[in-house]
Swiss-Prot record:
Record's protein name: Energy-coupling factor transporter transmembrane protein EcfT 1
Assembly with partners or alone: Forms a stable energy-coupling factor (ECF) transporter complex composed of 2 membrane-embedded substrate-binding proteins (S component), 2 ATP-binding proteins (A component) and 2 transmembrane proteins (T component). May be able to interact with more than 1 S component at a time.
Subcellular localization, as worded in the UniProt entry: Cell membrane
Membrane topology summary: Multi-pass membrane protein
UniProt similarity note: Belongs to the energy-coupling factor EcfT family.
Organism: Listeria monocytogenes serotype 1/2a (strain 08-5578)
Keywords: Cell membrane, Membrane, Transmembrane, Transmembrane helix, Transport
Length: 266
Protein backbone atom coordinates (compact mmCIF):
# COMPACT_ATOMS: atom_id res chain seq x y z
CA UNK A 1 0.00 0.00 0.00
CA UNK A 2 2.82 2.37 0.86
CA UNK A 3 4.43 2.23 -2.56
CA UNK A 4 1.07 3.15 -4.09
CA UNK A 5 1.02 6.60 -2.50
CA UNK A 6 0.98 9.03 -5.41
CA UNK A 7 0.51 12.41 -3.69
CA UNK A 8 3.70 14.50 -3.87
CA UNK A 9 5.11 12.95 -7.03
CA UNK A 10 5.57 14.70 -10.38
CA UNK A 11 4.98 13.03 -13.74
CA UNK A 12 6.51 14.92 -16.71
CA UNK A 13 4.20 15.54 -19.63
CA UNK A 14 3.02 17.98 -22.28
CA UNK A 15 -0.72 17.92 -21.61
CA UNK A 16 -2.97 20.96 -21.33
CA UNK A 17 -2.97 20.63 -17.55
CA UNK A 18 0.83 20.43 -17.45
CA UNK A 19 0.98 23.63 -19.49
CA UNK A 20 -1.15 25.67 -17.10
CA UNK A 21 0.54 28.13 -14.79
CA UNK A 22 1.22 26.63 -11.36
CA UNK A 23 -0.64 29.51 -9.70
CA UNK A 24 -3.70 28.77 -11.82
CA UNK A 25 -3.69 25.11 -10.84
CA UNK A 26 -3.18 25.88 -7.16
CA UNK A 27 -5.89 28.55 -7.00
CA UNK A 28 -8.24 26.41 -9.09
CA UNK A 29 -7.60 23.50 -6.72
CA UNK A 30 -8.55 25.55 -3.66
CA UNK A 31 -11.55 26.95 -5.50
CA UNK A 32 -12.61 23.44 -6.56
CA UNK A 33 -12.54 22.22 -2.95
CA UNK A 34 -14.62 25.23 -1.91
CA UNK A 35 -17.35 24.84 -4.51
CA UNK A 36 -17.43 21.07 -3.95
CA UNK A 37 -19.28 21.78 -0.72
CA UNK A 38 -22.04 23.40 -2.78
CA UNK A 39 -22.94 19.95 -4.11
CA UNK A 40 -25.97 18.66 -2.24
CA UNK A 41 -27.73 16.20 -4.56
CA UNK A 42 -27.04 13.50 -7.14
CA UNK A 43 -27.03 15.93 -10.06
CA UNK A 44 -24.46 18.25 -8.51
CA UNK A 45 -22.16 15.37 -7.58
CA UNK A 46 -22.59 13.88 -11.05
CA UNK A 47 -21.42 17.20 -12.49
CA UNK A 48 -18.37 17.29 -10.19
CA UNK A 49 -17.47 13.67 -10.99
CA UNK A 50 -17.80 14.32 -14.73
CA UNK A 51 -15.67 17.47 -14.48
CA UNK A 52 -13.00 15.66 -12.45
CA UNK A 53 -12.84 12.78 -14.94
CA UNK A 54 -12.45 15.29 -17.78
CA UNK A 55 -9.54 16.97 -15.96
CA UNK A 56 -7.91 13.59 -15.34
CA UNK A 57 -8.30 12.73 -19.02
CA UNK A 58 -6.69 16.04 -20.00
CA UNK A 59 -3.60 15.29 -17.87
CA UNK A 60 -2.67 12.40 -20.15
CA UNK A 61 -2.14 10.22 -17.07
CA UNK A 62 -4.10 7.00 -16.71
CA UNK A 63 -7.05 6.99 -14.30
CA UNK A 64 -5.67 3.96 -12.45
CA UNK A 65 -2.75 6.11 -11.28
CA UNK A 66 -5.17 8.42 -9.47
CA UNK A 67 -7.09 5.46 -8.06
CA UNK A 68 -3.80 4.21 -6.60
CA UNK A 69 -3.51 7.59 -4.89
CA UNK A 70 -6.88 7.04 -3.18
CA UNK A 71 -6.20 3.48 -1.97
CA UNK A 72 -3.75 4.33 0.88
CA UNK A 73 -6.42 6.59 2.42
CA UNK A 74 -9.40 4.31 1.82
CA UNK A 75 -9.65 3.17 5.45
CA UNK A 76 -9.73 6.75 6.72
CA UNK A 77 -12.42 7.56 4.15
CA UNK A 78 -14.49 4.49 5.06
CA UNK A 79 -14.20 5.29 8.78
CA UNK A 80 -15.56 8.78 8.17
CA UNK A 81 -18.36 7.35 6.00
CA UNK A 82 -19.35 4.85 8.71
CA UNK A 83 -19.46 7.64 11.31
CA UNK A 84 -21.75 9.62 9.03
CA UNK A 85 -24.03 6.63 8.48
CA UNK A 86 -24.29 5.68 12.17
CA UNK A 87 -24.71 9.11 13.72
CA UNK A 88 -26.53 11.19 11.08
CA UNK A 89 -30.30 11.11 11.60
CA UNK A 90 -33.16 12.12 9.35
CA UNK A 91 -35.45 10.66 6.74
CA UNK A 92 -36.58 7.04 6.96
CA UNK A 93 -35.15 5.10 9.93
CA UNK A 94 -33.90 1.61 8.98
CA UNK A 95 -32.10 0.71 12.20
CA UNK A 96 -32.09 2.25 15.67
CA UNK A 97 -30.10 0.92 18.60
CA UNK A 98 -28.89 3.20 21.37
CA UNK A 99 -26.81 6.06 19.92
CA UNK A 100 -26.55 4.32 16.55
CA UNK A 101 -29.08 5.11 13.86
CA UNK A 102 -29.10 4.10 10.22
CA UNK A 103 -31.41 6.28 8.18
CA UNK A 104 -31.92 7.23 4.56
CA UNK A 105 -30.35 10.62 5.26
CA UNK A 106 -27.31 9.00 6.89
CA UNK A 107 -26.79 6.61 3.98
CA UNK A 108 -27.12 9.40 1.44
CA UNK A 109 -24.79 11.64 3.42
CA UNK A 110 -22.28 8.78 3.70
CA UNK A 111 -22.21 8.36 -0.08
CA UNK A 112 -21.74 12.10 -0.56
CA UNK A 113 -18.91 12.23 2.00
CA UNK A 114 -17.20 9.33 0.22
CA UNK A 115 -17.45 11.10 -3.14
CA UNK A 116 -16.23 14.35 -1.62
CA UNK A 117 -13.12 12.75 -0.13
CA UNK A 118 -12.28 10.88 -3.34
CA UNK A 119 -12.75 13.94 -5.54
CA UNK A 120 -10.59 16.13 -3.28
CA UNK A 121 -7.79 13.54 -3.24
CA UNK A 122 -7.92 13.10 -7.03
CA UNK A 123 -7.86 16.84 -7.71
CA UNK A 124 -5.00 17.36 -5.23
CA UNK A 125 -3.13 14.55 -6.96
CA UNK A 126 -3.72 16.23 -10.33
CA UNK A 127 -1.92 19.33 -9.07
CA UNK A 128 1.12 17.51 -7.68
CA UNK A 129 1.44 15.11 -10.64
CA UNK A 130 1.41 17.92 -13.21
CA UNK A 131 3.42 20.59 -11.36
CA UNK A 132 7.14 20.53 -10.64
CA UNK A 133 8.13 21.07 -6.98
CA UNK A 134 9.96 24.28 -7.93
CA UNK A 135 6.94 25.76 -9.73
CA UNK A 136 4.71 24.70 -6.86
CA UNK A 137 6.98 26.51 -4.41
CA UNK A 138 6.92 29.67 -6.53
CA UNK A 139 3.12 29.47 -6.82
CA UNK A 140 2.68 29.13 -3.06
CA UNK A 141 5.04 32.06 -2.46
CA UNK A 142 3.11 34.18 -4.97
CA UNK A 143 -0.25 33.40 -3.38
CA UNK A 144 1.07 34.12 0.12
CA UNK A 145 2.83 37.31 -0.98
CA UNK A 146 0.20 39.69 0.55
CA UNK A 147 1.08 38.31 4.00
CA UNK A 148 4.65 39.55 3.56
CA UNK A 149 3.36 42.98 4.59
CA UNK A 150 2.73 41.48 8.04
CA UNK A 151 6.37 40.28 8.19
CA UNK A 152 5.32 36.69 7.53
CA UNK A 153 8.23 34.65 6.07
CA UNK A 154 6.32 33.80 2.91
CA UNK A 155 9.22 32.26 0.98
CA UNK A 156 10.26 30.07 3.90
CA UNK A 157 6.69 28.82 4.35
CA UNK A 158 6.41 28.07 0.64
CA UNK A 159 9.71 26.19 0.74
CA UNK A 160 8.62 24.13 3.76
CA UNK A 161 5.33 23.16 2.10
CA UNK A 162 7.09 22.21 -1.11
CA UNK A 163 9.73 20.15 0.69
CA UNK A 164 7.04 18.42 2.76
CA UNK A 165 5.13 17.45 -0.39
CA UNK A 166 8.31 16.30 -2.08
CA UNK A 167 9.33 14.16 0.88
CA UNK A 168 6.00 12.30 1.16
CA UNK A 169 6.85 9.67 -1.49
CA UNK A 170 10.47 9.57 -0.28
CA UNK A 171 9.48 8.79 3.31
CA UNK A 172 6.86 6.30 2.16
CA UNK A 173 9.51 4.52 0.13
CA UNK A 174 11.80 4.49 3.16
CA UNK A 175 9.00 3.03 5.29
CA UNK A 176 8.42 0.32 2.71
CA UNK A 177 12.12 -0.63 2.79
CA UNK A 178 12.09 -0.84 6.59
CA UNK A 179 8.95 -2.99 6.58
CA UNK A 180 10.47 -5.36 4.01
CA UNK A 181 13.60 -5.65 6.15
CA UNK A 182 11.43 -6.44 9.18
CA UNK A 183 9.51 -9.08 7.21
CA UNK A 184 12.81 -10.66 6.17
CA UNK A 185 13.53 -11.06 9.90
CA UNK A 186 10.24 -12.90 10.41
CA UNK A 187 7.97 -10.05 11.50
CA UNK A 188 4.34 -10.42 10.41
CA UNK A 189 2.45 -7.12 10.41
CA UNK A 190 -0.94 -8.78 9.87
CA UNK A 191 -1.07 -11.20 12.81
CA UNK A 192 -2.45 -10.74 16.31
CA UNK A 193 -4.94 -8.33 17.81
CA UNK A 194 -4.86 -4.56 17.47
CA UNK A 195 -2.48 -4.10 20.44
CA UNK A 196 -0.04 -6.69 19.10
CA UNK A 197 -0.09 -5.13 15.63
CA UNK A 198 0.61 -1.68 17.12
CA UNK A 199 3.49 -3.19 19.10
CA UNK A 200 4.97 -4.66 15.91
CA UNK A 201 4.75 -1.31 14.10
CA UNK A 202 6.68 0.58 16.82
CA UNK A 203 10.17 -0.61 15.68
CA UNK A 204 9.48 0.94 12.27
CA UNK A 205 9.26 4.48 13.62
CA UNK A 206 12.70 4.68 15.24
CA UNK A 207 14.73 4.01 12.05
CA UNK A 208 12.22 6.09 10.09
CA UNK A 209 12.75 9.09 12.38
CA UNK A 210 16.53 8.65 12.20
CA UNK A 211 16.38 8.47 8.40
CA UNK A 212 14.11 11.55 8.26
CA UNK A 213 16.48 13.63 10.41
CA UNK A 214 19.47 12.49 8.34
CA UNK A 215 17.74 13.46 5.10
CA UNK A 216 16.71 16.82 6.56
CA UNK A 217 20.29 17.52 7.66
CA UNK A 218 21.64 16.54 4.23
CA UNK A 219 19.12 18.84 2.56
CA UNK A 220 20.05 21.72 4.88
CA UNK A 221 23.77 21.22 4.18
CA UNK A 222 23.13 21.14 0.43
CA UNK A 223 21.10 24.37 0.58
CA UNK A 224 23.77 26.11 2.66
CA UNK A 225 26.48 24.93 0.25
CA UNK A 226 24.55 26.59 -2.57
CA UNK A 227 24.35 29.84 -0.64
CA UNK A 228 20.65 29.74 0.21
CA UNK A 229 19.85 32.53 2.67
CA UNK A 230 16.07 32.65 2.42
CA UNK A 231 13.82 34.10 -0.23
CA UNK A 232 14.87 37.73 0.14
CA UNK A 233 16.72 38.91 -2.96
CA UNK A 234 16.57 35.47 -4.53
CA UNK A 235 16.26 35.35 -8.30
CA UNK A 236 14.50 32.64 -10.30
CA UNK A 237 15.61 30.89 -13.47
CA UNK A 238 12.03 30.08 -14.51
CA UNK A 239 9.50 32.90 -14.24
CA UNK A 240 5.82 32.03 -13.98
CA UNK A 241 3.66 33.63 -16.67
CA UNK A 242 -0.07 33.77 -17.20
CA UNK A 243 -1.22 32.43 -20.57
CA UNK A 244 -4.44 32.33 -22.53
CA UNK A 245 -5.02 28.79 -21.30
CA UNK A 246 -5.11 30.08 -17.72
CA UNK A 247 -7.89 32.51 -18.68
CA UNK A 248 -9.81 29.63 -20.25
CA UNK A 249 -9.35 27.60 -17.05
CA UNK A 250 -10.74 30.48 -14.98
CA UNK A 251 -13.77 30.73 -17.27
CA UNK A 252 -14.34 26.97 -16.97
CA UNK A 253 -14.33 27.23 -13.17
CA UNK A 254 -16.90 30.05 -13.34
CA UNK A 255 -19.10 27.95 -15.64
CA UNK A 256 -18.73 25.00 -13.27
CA UNK A 257 -19.86 27.17 -10.37
CA UNK A 258 -22.86 28.39 -12.35
CA UNK A 259 -23.80 24.81 -13.22
CA UNK A 260 -23.55 23.80 -9.56
CA UNK A 261 -25.78 26.66 -8.44
CA UNK A 262 -28.39 25.84 -11.09
CA UNK A 263 -28.44 22.12 -10.27
CA UNK A 264 -28.40 22.84 -6.53
CA UNK A 265 -31.50 25.03 -6.66
CA UNK A 266 -33.44 23.10 -9.31
Amino acid sequence: MIEKLILGRFVPGESLIHGLDARTKLLAGFYYIGILFLANNWWTYALMVLFTLMVVQMTGIKLKVFIKGVKPLIWLILFTVVMQILFASGGTIYFDWGPFTISSFGLLNGVFVFLRFVLIIIMSTVITLTTTPMNLTDAIAYILRPFAVLKVPVNDIALMISVALRFIPTLMGETDKIMKAQRARGVDFGEGNLFEQMKVVVPIFIPLFVSSFNRAEELADAMEARGYQGGEGRTRFRILHWHFGDLIAACVMILLTAGLVILRTS
